[in-house]
Amino acid sequence: MKVQPSVKRICDKCQVVRRKGRVLVICSNPRHKQRQG
């Protein structure tokens, strides 16, 4: 899980999701997991 000031989609399977006020990127590739913070 990368914590970054701005999250971006890296590949086509990345999805930007809002959960509990946080912006997350979930993907089938675990290296692409990101959280805004």
UniProtKB/Swiss-Prot annotation:
<dbReference type="InterPro" id="IPR000473">
    <property type="entry name" value="Ribosomal_bL36"/>
</dbReference>
<dbReference type="GO" id="GO:0005737">
    <property type="term" value="C:cytoplasm"/>
</dbReference>
<dbReference type="InterPro" id="IPR035977">
    <property type="entry name" value="Ribosomal_bL36_sp"/>
</dbReference>
<keyword id="KW-0689">Ribosomal protein</keyword>
<dbReference type="GO" id="GO:1990904">
    <property type="term" value="C:ribonucleoprotein complex"/>
</dbReference>
<dbReference type="GO" id="GO:0003735">
    <property type="term" value="F:structural constituent of ribosome"/>
</dbReference>
<dbReference type="GO" id="GO:0006412">
    <property type="term" value="P:translation"/>
</dbReference>
<comment type="similarity">
    <text>Belongs to the bacterial ribosomal protein bL36 family.</text>
</comment>
<protein>
    <recommendedName>
        <fullName>Large ribosomal subunit protein bL36</fullName>
    </recommendedName>
</protein>
<dbReference type="Pfam" id="PF00444">
    <property type="entry name" value="Ribosomal_L36"/>
</dbReference>
<dbReference type="GO" id="GO:0005840">
    <property type="term" value="C:ribosome"/>
</dbReference>
<keyword id="KW-0687">Ribonucleoprotein</keyword>
